[in-house]
Amino acid sequence: VATALAAGLLVFDRYEGRSTKLLNVGTLVVMAGVTIVGVVTDASWMDTWLSPILNGFLLLIMVASVAVGRPFTMEYAKESAPPEVWDTPAFRHINTMITWVWIAAVAAMFVGAIVVALLQSGDIVTDPQTQKSIESWANWGVTIVALVVAMKFTGWYPDAYKERQQRLHGQAA
């Protein structure tokens, strides 16, 4: 199902005239790979390890986008920014910072998913209620906080950066 949704998102973006995004292609490739592995192997381990695997690959894609000098957020930002700003240092800086915040969010989710997987795969915590509580916080609590912080930062940072530059340089952005 997730593979079909990832493919559908790519098709929908193209239908709407939007560019193909690295993150969407990467997600489709990972989901297709996980689907194939699940079909051809004993996939019982996937119940425990699927979330860390997906978060790990997402994290790798995001870090790779920065490493090659094309922060993944630029692909999304270009859809709402005029072409004349795409190559400016400010546009690159803003998107690099936003990408790093999203990397931090996904890294937190990855760690939370690892904690949950480790708890589910062994007798680390002997009290079932304590284990369930830790799993809930590591899974849902971390995910919600990480995503909210990343979304808020994404909405806040571009204007905050431009305002700071105006104050520092005494000019309009």
PLM segments and residue spans:
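Structural signature of hydrophobic alpha-helical transmembrane segments
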Residues: V1-A4
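C-terminal ends of transmembrane helices
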Residues: A7-S19, T154
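Membrane-interface helix caps and helix-loop-helix hairpins in membrane proteins
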Residues: E16-R18, V40-T48
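Cytoplasmic-side transmembrane-helix entry/capping segments in multi-pass membrane proteins
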Residues: S19-M31, T48-F57
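Small-residue-rich segments of transmembrane alpha-helices in multi-pass membrane proteins
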Residues: T27-V39, L58-I61, Q171-A173
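Alpha-helical transmembrane segments
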Residues: D47-S65, N139-L147
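Membrane-water interface of transmembrane alpha-helices
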Residues: V63-S80, I98
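C-terminal membrane-adjacent module
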Residues: P82-A173
